[in-house]
């Protein structure tokens, strides 16, 4: 991801982007995640080796624990190619998160089929809350619905932008849950010389995570872009989805703190964070009202994503719309 490249010392260098079969990649990703300890014996055949080579082409630099791929997609023809190399006219560059993959999870519960549709509904809701995101959509095939988000580190012609996470810039370890604060994100924004609009944008994302139960909000899920002249900017929001497991060790509470707290936030905590961010008096409450208004429309966005009624209701009940104090 980003503009950094690593070239193998040995082996042939690919010269062009090749077409890929999403269905085959999903099946192989399931095999990889389910039988990762026995890969040597399971993919020795010619077709298996070809499929494994394909998934390595598109997936190894996407990052994260869940199965995903970097692809080039042609909107007119619906053709999908590897996104590692320039794909030619008509193609744009996307990150595809596989749906229906056995063993697909991050730190806790395995993702159910349809998880991508939840992320799509959340993307719609986040945009309604005024959060900046790239274009998102669902790629449907064989009863699966893969979440796609357009890459913000690639320009239309495929040229690259440098990207660094908050964790990378601050040398923060995202595995240390609760060790870092949203206030540190606001400080980093100031240190990079970004305008107040970037601080307001990040504050809005913090509120959305708190209200909509995106509790996998660690320091690698905030990123910054640098263009060729060396100018920094806050990257669009990403990994914005329902992530709450009240009985888990990871997402039972938030990964980053607000006013020193990881859960049970009060309006007083929001005001304190707003003061730390340099917001004018009353601005934090106004932003919270805007986010609340969008999250209250959750059933509308869930319907647009065609989520089952029981899933919609479970998530609605978990939303934290009752901040007091």
Regions found by a protein language model. Give the residues of each.
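Phosphate/dinucleotide-binding and metal-coordinating scaffold of catalytic cores
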Residues: 1-325
């Amino acid at each position: 991801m980003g503009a950094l490249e690593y070239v193998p010392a040995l082996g042939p260098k690919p010269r062009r982007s090749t077409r890929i079969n999403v269905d085959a990649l999903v099946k192989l990703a399931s095999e990889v995640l389910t039988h990762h300890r026995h890969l040597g014996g399971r993919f020795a055949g010619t077709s298996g080796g070809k499929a494994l080579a394909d998934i390595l082409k598109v997936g190894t630099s996407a990052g994260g624990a869940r199965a995903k791929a970097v692809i080039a997609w042609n909107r007119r023809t619906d053709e999908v190619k590897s996104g590692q190399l320039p794909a030619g006219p008509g193609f744009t560059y996307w990150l595809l998160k596989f749906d229906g993959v056995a063993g697909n999870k991050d730190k806790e519960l395995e993702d159910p089929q349809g998880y991508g549709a939840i992320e799509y509904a959340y993307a719609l809701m986040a945009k309604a809350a005024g959060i900046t995101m790239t274009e998102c959509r669902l790629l449907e095939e064989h009863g699966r619905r893969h979440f796609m988000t357009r890459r913000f580190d690639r320009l239309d012609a495929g040229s690259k932008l440098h990207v660094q996470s908050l964790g990378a810039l601050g040398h923060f370890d995202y595995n240390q849950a609760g060790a870092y604060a949203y206030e540190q994100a606001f400080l980093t924004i100031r240190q990079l010389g970004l305008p107040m609009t970037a601080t307001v944008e990040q504050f809005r994302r913090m509120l959305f995570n708190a209200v909509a139960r995106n509790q996998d909000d660690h320091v690698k899920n905030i990123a910054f872009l640098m263009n060729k002249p060396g100018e920094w900017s806050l990257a669009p929001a990403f990994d914005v989805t329902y992530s709450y497991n009240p009985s888990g060790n990871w997402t039972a509470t938030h990964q980053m703190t607000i006013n020193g707290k990881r859960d049970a936030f009060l309006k007083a905590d929001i005001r304190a964070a707003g003061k730390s961010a340099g917001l004018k008096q009353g601005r934090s409450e106004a932003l919270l009202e805007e986010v609340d208004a969008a999250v209250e429309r959750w059933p509308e966005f869930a319907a647009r994503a065609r989520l089952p009624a029981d899933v919609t209701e479970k998530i609605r009940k978990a939303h934290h719309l009752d901040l007091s104090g």
